[in-house]
Design a protein with these regions (language model features):
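Mature secreted bioactive peptide module from preproproteins
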Residues: 29-126
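N-terminal prepro-regions of secreted/extracellular proteins
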Residues: 1-47
Length: 126
């Protein structure tokens, strides 16, 4: 008798957990941007979860790495990753945050070694 009761509680708990997981995913946004040229690839990803305030911004290829590889020639080239919420936070090329974040955006701007101007932008949030 006691075992049946415990099994029913466990089953009900699992059903609630599944509903909560589905609801939470509805409050998260992800944005991606990819650039490929001459064998080089920049893949930027931003993610914002409204319920937890967790935000993540990441790039597989930082501006500093691009300079070292000779892809970027202009010293004014930059990568901006920002998180917006109660305050605005500047993030480095790769970061994870847990604040009251509403939106994350990433912006790459550089001149390639061939002299081409490139700008890449992605965001996720309100």
């Amino acid at each position: 008798m006691k075992t049946k009761f415990i099994k029913r509680i466990a089953a009900a708990g699992m059903a609630v957990a599944c509903m909560v997981a589905t609801t939470i995913s509805a409050f998260a946004l992800e944005g991606r941007s990819n650039w490929n040229e001459n064998g080089y690839s920049v893949d930027m990803k931003v993610y914002t979860d409204y319920l937890t305030g967790y935000a993540e911004a990441d790039s597989n290829y930082t501006i500093e790495e691009m300079r070292l590889d000779g892809v970027v020639s202009n010293p004014y080239s930059h990568a901006y990753l920002y998180a917006y919420g109660e305050n605005t936070y500047y993030i480095s090329d790769s970061a994870k945050l847990q604040y009251g974040v509403d939106k994350v955006e990433a912006n790459y701007y550089f001149y390639t070694s061939e002299g081409y101007e490139h700008s890449q932008y992605v965001n996720a949030g309100k």
